[in-house]
């Protein structure tokens, strides 16, 4: 059973500092989607079955110079649109993918491909869902071996 409370119930109606500022709390939730290939190349996604790092990589997913943009994986896109519909979102008809530039060791290209919102203004159990996106998963930094695995 899931119990929910309003802010008033949780604070016993006390006039708190948070209440006087009309605080809203947001969560960013990342959910891996199961597809046969990565979102922006044809590399397989069976990396959970592979123990060796960096065997499921190519010039496209590592962002090598001269590589042209690759279309988004339709299987992954369909999964995320289905999720947005389940969350009662309005679905955007056009899909735009942008590059968010970061200087992290788990992003060999120096950018992460992420969509503009695919779904907006949804709700689940009276909890507002602002927007739903799809984005590529960066590599996984392994602290034990001091290496990055780009199989993801």
Task: Describe each PLM feature range.
Residues 2-152:
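Basic, nucleic-acid-interacting segments
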């Amino acid at each position: 059973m899931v119990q929910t409370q309003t802010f008033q119930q949780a604070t016993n109606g006390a006039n708190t500092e948070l209440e006087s500022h009309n605080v809203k709390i947001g969560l960013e939730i990342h959910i891996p989607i199961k597809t046969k290939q990565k979102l922006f190349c044809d590399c397989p996604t069976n990396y959970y079955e592979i123990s060796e790092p960096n065997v499921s990589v190519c010039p496209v997913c590592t962002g090598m110079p001269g590589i042209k943009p690759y279309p988004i994986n339709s299987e992954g896109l369909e999964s995320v649109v289905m999720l947005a519909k389940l969350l009662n979102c309005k679905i955007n008809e056009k899909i735009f993918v942008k590059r968010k530039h970061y200087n992290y060791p788990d992003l060999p290209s120096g950018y992460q491909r992420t969509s503009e919102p695919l779904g907006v203004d949804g709700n689940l159990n009276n909890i507002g869902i602002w927007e739903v996106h799809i984005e590529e998963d960066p590599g996984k930094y392994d602290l034990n071996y001091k290496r990055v695995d780009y199989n993801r």
